[in-house]
Amino acid sequence: MRPAPPPPLLLLLLLLPPPSLSHDGTIIAATSPTSGQPSTELPGGKGLITTAKTIQNTDLAITGEKVMSATVSKGPLPGSSNSVSMTLAPTQKNTVIAPDQDEKVSTNPTIATSDSKGIPDLNKSILPSATNSMKPDTPVTQTAGPGAQGNPGTTVSHMTSENTEQTTSQPPPQVKPSSITPALTSIITPTSPRQPSANSTTLKPPESSSESPDKSHTASSSLGTKVVPSSSLYGTSPTRTSSVTFWGGPQSSSGTPPVPAPTPRPAATSSSTPGISSVPGTTSLPSETESLESPSSESPSQPPKLRPTGPPSSGSSGPAASLPDEGPRSSSTQRAATAPRAPSVPSPTSAQGDDRIKCESPGRLTDKMLLLNLTRSGLCAGNNSDDKLITLLCRAAKATFNPAQDQCHIRLVPIQDTQAVAIKEITVQTNLLPRDVYELLKDKWDELKEVGVSNMKLGDQGPPEETEDRFSMPLIITIVCMASFLLLVAALYGCCHQRLSQRKDQQRLTEELQTVENGYHDNPTLEVMETSSEMQEKKVVNLNGELGDSWIVPLDNLAKDDLDEEEDTHL
Protein backbone atom coordinates (compact mmCIF):
# COMPACT_ATOMS: atom_id res chain seq x y z
CA MET A 1 0.00 0.00 0.00
CA ARG A 2 1.46 3.33 -1.03
CA PRO A 3 1.66 5.79 1.84
CA ALA A 4 -0.38 8.93 1.75
CA PRO A 5 1.43 12.17 0.80
CA PRO A 6 2.03 14.69 3.57
CA PRO A 7 -0.70 17.30 3.96
CA PRO A 8 0.08 20.92 3.20
CA LEU A 9 -0.48 21.80 6.86
CA LEU A 10 2.71 20.03 7.90
CA LEU A 11 4.58 21.83 5.15
CA LEU A 12 3.35 25.12 6.56
CA LEU A 13 4.33 23.94 10.02
CA LEU A 14 7.93 23.19 9.07
CA LEU A 15 8.54 25.90 6.49
CA LEU A 16 6.75 29.02 7.67
CA PRO A 17 7.69 30.77 10.93
CA PRO A 18 4.74 31.63 13.19
CA PRO A 19 3.75 35.27 13.52
CA SER A 20 3.65 37.36 16.70
CA LEU A 21 7.41 37.29 17.37
CA SER A 22 7.65 40.46 19.40
CA HIS A 23 5.70 39.53 22.55
CA ASP A 24 6.71 38.74 26.07
CA GLY A 25 8.26 35.28 25.48
CA THR A 26 5.55 32.74 26.48
CA ILE A 27 6.07 29.42 24.69
CA ILE A 28 3.21 27.11 23.76
CA ALA A 29 3.74 23.60 22.43
CA ALA A 30 0.40 22.37 21.16
CA THR A 31 -0.80 19.65 18.86
CA SER A 32 -4.35 18.37 18.41
CA PRO A 33 -4.69 14.69 17.52
CA THR A 34 -8.46 14.40 17.19
CA SER A 35 -9.54 17.32 15.10
CA GLY A 36 -8.53 17.55 11.49
CA GLN A 37 -8.96 21.33 11.35
CA PRO A 38 -5.98 23.68 11.74
CA SER A 39 -5.70 25.42 15.04
CA THR A 40 -6.74 29.01 15.14
CA GLU A 41 -5.97 31.99 17.30
CA LEU A 42 -7.50 32.31 20.72
CA PRO A 43 -9.94 35.05 21.51
CA GLY A 44 -8.35 38.32 22.32
CA GLY A 45 -6.46 38.90 19.09
CA LYS A 46 -3.05 38.26 20.65
CA GLY A 47 -1.93 35.77 18.06
CA LEU A 48 -1.75 32.55 20.06
CA ILE A 49 -0.13 29.94 17.80
CA THR A 50 -0.24 26.19 17.72
CA THR A 51 2.78 24.65 16.09
CA ALA A 52 1.52 21.29 14.94
CA LYS A 53 -1.36 19.93 12.91
CA THR A 54 -2.96 16.56 13.22
CA ILE A 55 -3.19 13.66 10.86
CA GLN A 56 -5.94 11.08 11.38
CA ASN A 57 -4.48 7.55 11.53
CA THR A 58 -1.29 8.65 9.71
CA ASP A 59 1.83 10.12 11.19
CA LEU A 60 5.15 11.52 10.07
CA ALA A 61 8.28 9.72 11.17
CA ILE A 62 11.46 11.74 10.91
CA THR A 63 14.10 9.09 10.86
CA GLY A 64 17.82 9.22 11.57
CA GLU A 65 20.38 7.85 13.90
CA LYS A 66 18.96 10.11 16.57
CA VAL A 67 16.38 12.87 16.00
CA MET A 68 15.55 15.39 18.66
CA SER A 69 12.08 16.80 18.13
CA ALA A 70 11.28 20.12 19.72
CA THR A 71 7.92 21.84 19.58
CA VAL A 72 8.29 25.51 20.36
CA SER A 73 5.75 28.24 19.91
CA LYS A 74 5.20 31.66 21.23
CA GLY A 75 2.17 33.71 22.02
CA PRO A 76 1.09 36.20 24.63
CA LEU A 77 -1.08 35.26 27.52
CA PRO A 78 -2.41 37.62 30.09
CA GLY A 79 -0.64 37.35 33.38
CA SER A 80 2.34 35.37 32.08
CA SER A 81 5.85 36.68 31.48
CA ASN A 82 9.06 34.98 30.28
CA SER A 83 7.76 31.44 30.74
CA VAL A 84 9.49 28.89 28.53
CA SER A 85 8.47 25.31 27.88
CA MET A 86 10.39 23.09 25.50
CA THR A 87 9.65 19.51 24.60
CA LEU A 88 12.81 17.61 23.73
CA ALA A 89 12.57 13.86 23.21
CA PRO A 90 15.17 11.33 22.03
CA THR A 91 14.46 8.57 19.60
CA GLN A 92 13.90 5.02 20.74
CA LYS A 93 13.27 1.73 19.03
CA ASN A 94 9.60 0.79 18.52
CA THR A 95 8.29 3.58 20.73
CA VAL A 96 4.97 5.30 20.07
CA ILE A 97 3.14 7.85 22.17
CA ALA A 98 -0.63 7.46 22.00
CA PRO A 99 -2.52 10.68 21.44
CA ASP A 100 -4.73 12.22 24.07
CA GLN A 101 -8.28 11.52 23.05
CA ASP A 102 -10.25 13.86 25.29
CA GLU A 103 -8.71 17.09 23.96
CA LYS A 104 -7.39 18.02 27.37
CA VAL A 105 -4.11 19.65 28.14
CA SER A 106 -1.38 17.14 27.40
CA THR A 107 2.34 17.66 27.40
CA ASN A 108 3.51 14.29 26.08
CA PRO A 109 6.74 14.64 24.04
CA THR A 110 6.85 13.63 20.43
CA ILE A 111 9.12 10.61 20.01
CA ALA A 112 10.56 9.44 16.69
CA THR A 113 11.44 5.79 16.24
CA SER A 114 14.64 4.14 15.12
CA ASP A 115 16.14 0.76 15.71
CA SER A 116 19.15 0.04 17.88
CA LYS A 117 21.55 0.22 14.92
CA GLY A 118 20.56 3.72 13.94
CA ILE A 119 18.41 2.64 10.93
CA PRO A 120 15.16 4.53 10.88
CA ASP A 121 11.92 2.58 11.16
CA LEU A 122 9.43 4.16 8.84
CA ASN A 123 6.60 1.81 9.87
CA LYS A 124 6.30 3.38 13.28
CA SER A 125 3.94 6.22 13.83
CA ILE A 126 4.08 9.34 15.89
CA LEU A 127 0.80 10.70 17.13
CA PRO A 128 1.06 14.33 18.17
CA SER A 129 -0.88 15.58 21.13
CA ALA A 130 -2.41 18.90 21.92
CA THR A 131 -0.60 21.21 24.28
CA ASN A 132 -1.79 24.53 25.55
CA SER A 133 0.22 27.38 27.01
CA MET A 134 1.37 27.11 30.56
CA LYS A 135 0.98 29.87 33.07
CA PRO A 136 3.90 30.94 35.27
CA ASP A 137 4.77 28.88 38.33
CA THR A 138 2.81 25.86 37.02
CA PRO A 139 4.63 22.50 37.08
CA VAL A 140 3.97 20.25 34.12
CA THR A 141 4.98 16.61 33.99
CA GLN A 142 5.62 14.79 30.73
CA THR A 143 5.70 11.02 30.91
CA ALA A 144 6.20 8.39 28.24
CA GLY A 145 3.91 5.43 28.68
CA PRO A 146 5.37 2.20 29.97
CA GLY A 147 6.48 -0.41 27.47
CA ALA A 148 6.89 -4.17 27.49
CA GLN A 149 10.44 -4.46 26.17
CA GLY A 150 12.19 -3.06 29.20
CA ASN A 151 14.15 -0.31 27.37
CA PRO A 152 14.42 2.95 29.29
CA GLY A 153 11.90 5.59 28.44
CA THR A 154 11.83 9.24 29.33
CA THR A 155 10.12 11.15 32.10
CA VAL A 156 10.57 14.89 31.75
CA SER A 157 9.46 17.26 34.45
CA HIS A 158 9.33 20.98 33.66
CA MET A 159 9.05 23.58 36.40
CA THR A 160 8.35 26.84 34.61
CA SER A 161 8.73 30.15 36.42
CA GLU A 162 9.55 33.71 35.49
CA ASN A 163 13.31 33.34 35.12
CA THR A 164 14.12 29.67 35.83
CA GLU A 165 13.60 26.33 34.14
CA GLN A 166 14.88 22.95 35.28
CA THR A 167 14.63 19.67 33.45
CA THR A 168 15.38 16.25 34.83
CA SER A 169 15.53 13.05 32.88
CA GLN A 170 14.73 9.61 34.26
CA PRO A 171 14.88 6.27 32.51
CA PRO A 172 11.34 5.12 31.59
CA PRO A 173 10.49 1.75 30.09
CA GLN A 174 10.10 1.30 26.37
CA VAL A 175 6.58 1.35 24.96
CA LYS A 176 5.28 -1.07 22.38
CA PRO A 177 3.05 0.31 19.69
CA SER A 178 -0.62 -0.53 20.37
CA SER A 179 -2.09 0.49 17.08
CA ILE A 180 0.51 1.07 14.38
CA THR A 181 -0.75 2.69 11.27
CA PRO A 182 1.16 2.93 8.02
CA ALA A 183 3.66 5.73 8.31
CA LEU A 184 4.69 8.14 5.70
CA THR A 185 7.69 6.77 3.91
CA SER A 186 8.43 9.94 2.08
CA ILE A 187 10.37 12.61 3.90
CA ILE A 188 9.36 16.21 3.59
CA THR A 189 11.79 18.10 1.42
CA PRO A 190 11.24 21.86 1.26
CA THR A 191 11.14 23.31 -2.22
CA SER A 192 13.04 26.41 -1.30
CA PRO A 193 15.10 27.12 1.81
CA ARG A 194 13.30 29.46 4.12
CA GLN A 195 15.02 32.24 5.93
CA PRO A 196 15.94 31.62 9.55
CA SER A 197 13.52 33.02 12.05
CA ALA A 198 13.37 33.47 15.77
CA ASN A 199 10.87 30.68 16.41
CA SER A 200 12.33 28.10 14.05
CA THR A 201 13.48 24.78 15.45
CA THR A 202 16.66 23.32 14.04
CA LEU A 203 17.02 19.56 14.14
CA LYS A 204 20.52 18.18 13.71
CA PRO A 205 21.63 14.61 13.08
CA PRO A 206 23.69 13.00 15.81
CA GLU A 207 27.20 11.63 15.62
CA SER A 208 27.85 8.08 14.51
CA SER A 209 28.15 5.28 17.05
CA SER A 210 31.93 5.54 16.93
CA GLU A 211 31.89 9.00 18.46
CA SER A 212 32.68 9.15 22.13
CA PRO A 213 29.78 9.86 24.51
CA ASP A 214 29.53 12.59 27.05
CA LYS A 215 29.54 15.34 24.44
CA SER A 216 27.35 18.32 25.08
CA HIS A 217 26.17 21.13 22.84
CA THR A 218 25.42 24.53 24.21
CA ALA A 219 23.55 27.29 22.41
CA SER A 220 23.77 30.81 23.78
CA SER A 221 20.67 32.94 24.34
CA SER A 222 19.60 36.09 26.09
CA LEU A 223 18.79 36.80 29.73
CA GLY A 224 15.86 35.21 31.50
CA THR A 225 16.00 31.39 31.44
CA LYS A 226 18.24 28.47 32.36
CA VAL A 227 19.42 25.18 30.97
CA VAL A 228 17.13 22.53 29.55
CA PRO A 229 19.16 19.31 29.34
CA SER A 230 17.77 16.32 27.52
CA SER A 231 19.18 12.85 27.29
CA SER A 232 19.13 10.81 24.12
CA LEU A 233 19.09 7.05 23.87
CA TYR A 234 20.83 5.22 21.08
CA GLY A 235 19.83 1.58 21.35
CA THR A 236 20.35 0.78 25.01
CA SER A 237 23.06 3.29 25.92
CA PRO A 238 23.04 7.07 25.42
CA THR A 239 25.47 8.37 22.85
CA ARG A 240 25.48 12.08 23.60
CA THR A 241 23.66 14.68 25.65
CA SER A 242 22.29 17.82 24.07
CA SER A 243 21.74 20.91 26.16
CA VAL A 244 20.27 24.32 25.51
CA THR A 245 21.85 27.09 27.55
CA PHE A 246 19.97 30.26 28.37
CA TRP A 247 21.56 33.45 29.62
CA GLY A 248 19.87 33.92 33.01
CA GLY A 249 21.23 30.99 35.01
CA PRO A 250 23.40 28.85 32.74
CA GLN A 251 23.37 25.13 33.41
CA SER A 252 24.43 22.23 31.24
CA SER A 253 23.69 18.56 31.47
CA SER A 254 26.47 16.06 31.78
CA GLY A 255 26.58 13.02 29.56
CA THR A 256 26.72 10.40 32.33
CA PRO A 257 23.87 7.92 32.04
CA PRO A 258 21.24 7.25 33.11
CA VAL A 259 20.17 10.59 34.63
CA PRO A 260 22.17 13.68 33.50
CA ALA A 261 22.58 16.02 36.45
CA PRO A 262 22.62 19.72 35.49
CA THR A 263 25.90 21.36 36.42
CA PRO A 264 26.51 25.10 36.37
CA ARG A 265 28.40 26.48 33.43
CA PRO A 266 29.42 30.10 32.99
CA ALA A 267 27.62 31.95 30.28
CA ALA A 268 30.96 33.09 28.85
CA THR A 269 31.85 29.51 27.94
CA SER A 270 28.70 28.82 25.97
CA SER A 271 29.24 28.47 22.26
CA SER A 272 27.53 31.45 20.74
CA THR A 273 27.02 32.33 17.13
CA PRO A 274 28.33 35.78 16.14
CA GLY A 275 25.81 38.32 15.05
CA ILE A 276 23.02 37.38 17.52
CA SER A 277 21.57 40.13 19.65
CA SER A 278 20.21 39.46 23.11
CA VAL A 279 17.29 41.27 24.68
CA PRO A 280 16.46 40.89 28.41
CA GLY A 281 13.28 38.93 28.98
CA THR A 282 13.42 37.05 25.69
CA THR A 283 15.46 34.21 24.36
CA SER A 284 17.60 34.61 21.27
CA LEU A 285 19.21 31.55 19.81
CA PRO A 286 20.81 31.03 16.40
CA SER A 287 18.41 29.31 14.09
CA GLU A 288 19.10 27.76 10.75
CA THR A 289 17.02 26.69 7.80
CA GLU A 290 15.92 23.09 7.88
CA SER A 291 16.94 20.97 4.95
CA LEU A 292 15.55 17.48 4.87
CA GLU A 293 16.99 14.93 2.48
CA SER A 294 14.88 12.19 1.01
CA PRO A 295 15.94 8.69 2.08
CA SER A 296 15.30 7.36 -1.40
CA SER A 297 18.52 8.98 -2.62
CA GLU A 298 20.59 7.24 0.05
CA SER A 299 21.26 3.64 0.91
CA PRO A 300 18.99 1.98 3.49
CA SER A 301 21.86 1.70 5.94
CA GLN A 302 22.42 5.46 5.96
CA PRO A 303 19.64 7.46 7.63
CA PRO A 304 18.64 10.81 6.19
CA LYS A 305 20.36 13.79 7.67
CA LEU A 306 19.22 17.32 8.27
CA ARG A 307 21.80 19.81 7.08
CA PRO A 308 21.71 23.55 7.72
CA THR A 309 21.58 25.66 4.59
CA GLY A 310 21.19 29.16 5.95
CA PRO A 311 23.33 31.47 8.07
CA PRO A 312 22.41 32.13 11.70
CA SER A 313 19.83 34.80 12.30
CA SER A 314 20.82 38.09 13.86
CA GLY A 315 18.70 40.33 16.01
CA SER A 316 16.03 37.71 16.73
CA SER A 317 13.81 38.43 19.71
CA GLY A 318 11.65 35.29 20.02
CA PRO A 319 12.76 32.00 21.55
CA ALA A 320 14.24 29.40 19.27
CA ALA A 321 15.77 26.06 20.20
CA SER A 322 18.85 25.06 18.25
CA LEU A 323 20.50 21.70 18.61
CA PRO A 324 23.84 22.16 16.87
CA ASP A 325 25.47 19.28 15.13
CA GLU A 326 29.07 18.34 15.56
CA GLY A 327 30.71 16.95 12.50
CA PRO A 328 32.78 13.79 12.49
CA ARG A 329 35.94 15.87 12.55
CA SER A 330 37.04 18.13 15.32
CA SER A 331 37.88 21.79 14.82
CA SER A 332 41.60 21.10 15.05
CA THR A 333 41.31 18.47 12.31
CA GLN A 334 39.41 20.87 10.10
CA ARG A 335 41.98 23.60 10.69
CA ALA A 336 44.73 21.17 9.83
CA ALA A 337 42.94 20.17 6.64
CA THR A 338 42.30 23.74 5.55
CA ALA A 339 45.69 25.15 6.56
CA PRO A 340 47.79 26.04 3.51
CA ARG A 341 50.91 24.05 3.07
CA ALA A 342 54.21 25.82 2.72
CA PRO A 343 55.93 25.29 -0.62
CA SER A 344 58.77 22.87 -0.57
CA VAL A 345 62.08 24.71 -0.29
CA PRO A 346 64.96 23.20 -2.25
CA SER A 347 68.06 22.21 -0.37
CA PRO A 348 70.89 24.78 -0.21
CA THR A 349 73.22 22.53 -2.19
CA SER A 350 70.91 22.14 -5.15
CA ALA A 351 69.81 25.76 -5.08
CA GLN A 352 73.41 26.95 -4.91
CA GLY A 353 74.48 24.67 -7.75
CA ASP A 354 71.63 25.81 -9.99
CA ASP A 355 72.39 29.41 -9.18
CA ARG A 356 76.11 29.26 -9.79
CA ILE A 357 76.03 27.53 -13.17
CA LYS A 358 73.89 28.69 -16.05
CA CYS A 359 73.98 26.76 -19.28
CA GLU A 360 72.90 28.42 -22.48
CA SER A 361 71.81 26.84 -25.73
CA PRO A 362 74.40 24.60 -27.37
CA GLY A 363 76.61 26.20 -29.96
CA ARG A 364 79.32 25.36 -32.38
CA LEU A 365 83.02 25.29 -31.58
CA THR A 366 85.01 28.42 -32.40
CA ASP A 367 88.64 29.42 -31.88
CA LYS A 368 87.81 32.20 -29.43
CA MET A 369 86.11 29.94 -26.90
CA LEU A 370 87.73 28.64 -23.75
CA LEU A 371 86.96 24.94 -23.81
CA LEU A 372 87.04 22.46 -20.98
CA ASN A 373 86.93 18.79 -21.92
CA LEU A 374 85.31 16.87 -19.09
CA THR A 375 85.97 13.19 -18.58
CA ARG A 376 82.80 12.79 -16.56
CA SER A 377 79.31 14.02 -17.29
CA GLY A 378 79.24 17.70 -18.10
CA LEU A 379 78.11 20.44 -15.81
CA CYS A 380 75.25 21.22 -18.16
CA ALA A 381 74.07 17.61 -18.05
CA GLY A 382 72.70 18.11 -14.56
CA ASN A 383 75.82 17.15 -12.58
CA ASN A 384 76.17 20.34 -10.58
CA SER A 385 77.49 18.62 -7.48
CA ASP A 386 81.15 19.03 -8.45
CA ASP A 387 81.89 21.91 -6.09
CA LYS A 388 85.65 21.62 -6.46
CA LEU A 389 85.56 22.43 -10.16
CA ILE A 390 83.26 25.38 -9.57
CA THR A 391 85.49 26.68 -6.77
CA LEU A 392 88.59 26.42 -8.96
CA LEU A 393 86.91 28.36 -11.75
CA CYS A 394 85.78 31.05 -9.34
CA ARG A 395 89.22 31.36 -7.74
CA ALA A 396 90.70 31.71 -11.18
CA ALA A 397 88.53 34.78 -11.64
CA LYS A 398 89.25 36.11 -8.14
CA ALA A 399 92.29 34.99 -6.18
CA THR A 400 90.72 35.89 -2.83
CA PHE A 401 87.46 34.08 -3.56
CA ASN A 402 85.67 33.15 -0.34
CA PRO A 403 82.58 30.93 -0.76
CA ALA A 404 81.13 32.22 2.49
CA GLN A 405 81.34 35.85 1.35
CA ASP A 406 81.39 35.79 -2.44
CA GLN A 407 78.88 34.54 -4.98
CA CYS A 408 80.15 33.10 -8.23
CA HIS A 409 78.10 32.79 -11.42
CA ILE A 410 79.43 30.84 -14.39
CA ARG A 411 77.86 30.93 -17.84
CA LEU A 412 78.63 27.86 -19.90
CA VAL A 413 77.86 26.84 -23.47
CA PRO A 414 77.81 23.10 -24.11
CA ILE A 415 79.39 21.88 -27.32
CA GLN A 416 77.32 19.61 -29.50
CA ASP A 417 78.19 15.90 -29.66
CA THR A 418 80.96 16.25 -27.06
CA GLN A 419 81.37 16.49 -23.32
CA ALA A 420 83.24 19.77 -23.66
CA VAL A 421 81.85 23.04 -22.38
CA ALA A 422 82.85 26.57 -23.27
CA ILE A 423 83.24 29.14 -20.52
CA LYS A 424 81.51 32.27 -21.65
CA GLU A 425 81.58 34.37 -18.50
CA ILE A 426 82.55 34.12 -14.83
CA THR A 427 81.07 36.66 -12.47
CA VAL A 428 82.10 36.94 -8.83
CA GLN A 429 79.89 39.01 -6.57
CA THR A 430 81.44 40.04 -3.27
CA ASN A 431 79.21 40.82 -0.32
CA LEU A 432 81.14 43.09 2.04
CA LEU A 433 80.04 44.14 5.48
CA PRO A 434 80.17 47.86 6.38
CA ARG A 435 83.23 47.34 8.59
CA ASP A 436 85.11 45.68 5.76
CA VAL A 437 84.28 48.58 3.46
CA TYR A 438 85.42 51.06 6.12
CA GLU A 439 88.76 49.32 6.52
CA LEU A 440 89.28 49.44 2.76
CA LEU A 441 88.33 53.12 2.45
CA LYS A 442 90.58 54.24 5.30
CA ASP A 443 93.62 53.75 3.11
CA LYS A 444 92.04 55.83 0.34
CA TRP A 445 90.70 58.70 2.40
CA ASP A 446 92.83 61.27 0.61
CA GLU A 447 91.39 60.19 -2.72
CA LEU A 448 87.90 60.36 -1.30
CA LYS A 449 88.50 63.93 -0.15
CA GLU A 450 89.66 64.85 -3.61
CA VAL A 451 86.47 63.56 -5.20
CA GLY A 452 84.30 65.51 -2.75
CA VAL A 453 83.82 63.29 0.32
CA SER A 454 83.99 65.47 3.42
CA ASN A 455 83.31 62.97 6.18
CA MET A 456 83.11 59.23 6.78
CA LYS A 457 81.76 57.71 9.96
CA LEU A 458 81.11 54.17 11.16
CA GLY A 459 79.67 54.13 14.66
CA ASP A 460 82.12 56.04 16.82
CA GLN A 461 84.88 55.89 14.23
CA GLY A 462 85.42 58.78 11.88
CA PRO A 463 87.81 59.54 9.03
CA PRO A 464 91.38 58.25 9.35
CA GLU A 465 92.97 61.69 9.92
CA GLU A 466 90.82 62.33 12.93
CA THR A 467 91.88 59.09 14.60
CA GLU A 468 95.53 58.76 13.50
CA ASP A 469 96.95 62.29 12.79
CA ARG A 470 95.42 63.80 15.89
CA PHE A 471 98.39 62.62 18.00
CA SER A 472 100.99 61.28 15.57
CA MET A 473 101.89 64.43 13.64
CA PRO A 474 102.25 66.75 16.65
CA LEU A 475 104.27 64.10 18.42
CA ILE A 476 106.58 63.70 15.49
CA ILE A 477 107.02 67.47 15.18
CA THR A 478 107.76 67.76 18.90
CA ILE A 479 110.33 64.98 18.79
CA VAL A 480 112.12 66.54 15.81
CA CYS A 481 112.20 69.96 17.43
CA MET A 482 113.55 68.62 20.71
CA ALA A 483 116.25 66.66 18.92
CA SER A 484 117.32 69.72 16.94
CA PHE A 485 117.45 71.83 20.08
CA LEU A 486 119.55 69.25 21.90
CA LEU A 487 121.99 69.09 19.01
CA LEU A 488 122.32 72.88 18.99
CA VAL A 489 122.97 73.02 22.72
CA ALA A 490 125.60 70.29 22.47
CA ALA A 491 127.38 72.13 19.65
CA LEU A 492 127.45 75.41 21.58
CA TYR A 493 128.81 73.71 24.68
CA GLY A 494 131.57 72.00 22.72
CA CYS A 495 132.71 75.20 21.07
CA CYS A 496 132.80 77.14 24.31
CA HIS A 497 134.71 74.45 26.17
CA GLN A 498 137.34 74.20 23.46
CA ARG A 499 137.96 77.90 23.42
CA LEU A 500 138.36 78.04 27.19
CA SER A 501 140.92 75.24 27.21
CA GLN A 502 142.94 76.87 24.46
CA ARG A 503 143.02 80.15 26.32
CA LYS A 504 144.32 78.47 29.47
CA ASP A 505 147.17 76.73 27.63
CA GLN A 506 148.22 79.88 25.82
CA GLN A 507 148.27 81.91 29.01
CA ARG A 508 150.53 79.38 30.77
CA LEU A 509 153.08 79.34 27.98
CA THR A 510 153.16 83.10 27.93
CA GLU A 511 153.95 83.26 31.63
CA GLU A 512 156.85 80.77 31.33
CA LEU A 513 158.47 82.67 28.49
CA GLN A 514 158.30 85.88 30.41
CA THR A 515 160.12 84.35 33.46
CA VAL A 516 162.92 82.93 31.32
CA GLU A 517 163.49 86.24 29.65
CA ASN A 518 163.71 88.01 33.01
CA GLY A 519 166.37 85.47 34.34
CA TYR A 520 164.21 83.96 36.95
CA HIS A 521 163.40 80.30 36.84
CA ASP A 522 162.98 77.46 39.25
CA ASN A 523 165.30 74.89 37.60
CA PRO A 524 168.96 75.16 38.95
CA THR A 525 170.35 72.49 36.66
CA LEU A 526 169.25 74.49 33.68
CA GLU A 527 171.56 77.30 34.69
CA VAL A 528 174.59 74.92 35.28
CA MET A 529 174.11 73.29 31.95
CA GLU A 530 173.79 76.58 30.25
CA THR A 531 176.85 78.10 31.96
CA SER A 532 179.30 75.14 31.87
CA SER A 533 179.91 74.36 28.28
CA GLU A 534 182.94 72.27 28.97
CA MET A 535 181.05 69.70 30.96
CA GLN A 536 178.53 69.44 28.19
CA GLU A 537 181.27 68.81 25.70
CA LYS A 538 182.84 66.18 27.86
CA LYS A 539 179.62 64.43 28.22
CA VAL A 540 179.20 64.43 24.56
CA VAL A 541 182.65 62.99 23.99
CA ASN A 542 182.29 60.39 26.66
CA LEU A 543 178.94 59.44 25.39
CA ASN A 544 180.10 59.20 21.88
CA GLY A 545 183.11 57.10 22.85
CA GLU A 546 181.31 54.75 25.11
CA LEU A 547 178.04 54.62 23.37
CA GLY A 548 179.13 54.60 19.82
CA ASP A 549 177.75 51.24 18.94
CA SER A 550 174.81 50.99 21.34
CA TRP A 551 171.94 53.06 22.61
CA ILE A 552 171.96 51.38 26.01
CA VAL A 553 173.91 53.32 28.57
CA PRO A 554 174.42 52.00 32.14
CA LEU A 555 173.18 54.52 34.65
CA ASP A 556 175.76 53.62 37.26
CA ASN A 557 178.63 54.33 34.97
CA LEU A 558 177.17 57.62 33.92
CA ALA A 559 176.53 58.61 37.51
CA LYS A 560 180.11 57.73 38.56
CA ASP A 561 181.62 59.56 35.66
CA ASP A 562 179.56 62.60 36.34
CA LEU A 563 180.50 62.61 39.97
CA ASP A 564 184.23 62.28 39.21
CA GLU A 565 184.16 65.02 36.69
CA GLU A 566 182.35 67.27 39.00
CA GLU A 567 184.77 66.60 41.72
CA ASP A 568 187.64 67.27 39.43
CA THR A 569 186.10 70.43 38.23
CA HIS A 570 185.63 71.82 41.66
CA LEU A 571 189.14 71.04 42.59
Curated annotation (Swiss-Prot):
Question: What ranges does the Cytoplasmic topological domain annotation cover?
Answer: 496-571
Q: Region Disordered: which residues?
A: 94-361
Annotated Pro residues bias = 301-311
Q: Which residues cross the membrane?
A: 475-495
Q: What is the effect of changing N123Q?
A: Does not reduce N-glycosylation
Pfam families for the chain? CD34_antigen
Membrane topology of the entry: Single-pass type I membrane protein
Locate the compositionally biased regions of type Polar residues: 106-116, 126-144, 151-169, 176-203, 218-245
Q: Which UniProt keywords apply?
A: Cell adhesion, Cell membrane, Cell projection, Glycoprotein, Membrane, Phosphoprotein, Signal, Transmembrane, Transmembrane helix
As given in the record, the signal peptide range reads 1-22
Q: Which residues carry this modification: Phosphoserine?
A: S550
> What spans does the record annotate as topological domain Extracellular, numbered to this chain?
23-474
Q: So which tissues is this one expressed in?
A: Expressed in glomerular and tubular epithelial cells and peritubular capillaries of the kidney (at protein level). Expressed in heart, lung, renal cortex and medulla, kidney and muscle.
Q: Where in the sequence does glycosylation occur per the annotation?
A: N123, N199, N373, N383
What does the PTM comment state? Answer: N- and O-linked glycosylated. Sialoglycoprotein.
Q: Which residues carry this modification: Phosphothreonine?
A: T531, T569
Q: Which family does it belong to?
A: Belongs to the podocalyxin family.
Q: What is known of its domains?
A: The large highly anionic extracellular domain allows to maintain open filtration pathways between neighboring podocyte foot processes. The cytoplasmic C-terminus PDZ-binding motif (DTHL) is essential for interaction with NHERF1 and for targeting NHERF1 to the apical cell membrane. The extracellular domain is necessary for microvillus formation. Both the O-glycan-rich domain of the extracellular domain and the C-terminus PDZ-binding motif (DTHL) in the cytoplasmic tail harbor an apical sorting signal. The cytoplasmic domain is necessary for the apical membrane targeting and renal tubulogenesis.
Subunit composition and interactions:
Found in a complex with EZR, PODXL and NHERF2. Associates with the actin cytoskeleton through complex formation with EZR and NHERF2. Interacts (via the C-terminal PDZ-binding motif DTHL) with NHERF1 (via the PDZ domains); interaction is not detected in glomerular epithelium cells. Interacts (via the C-terminal PDZ-binding motif DTHL) with NHERF2 (via the PDZ 1 domain); interaction is detected in glomerular epithelium cells. Interacts with EZR. Monomer; when associated with the membrane raft. Oligomer; when integrated in the apical membrane. Interacts with NHERF2.
Q: What is this protein called?
A: Podocalyxin
| The organism of origin for this protein | Canis lupus familiaris (Dog)
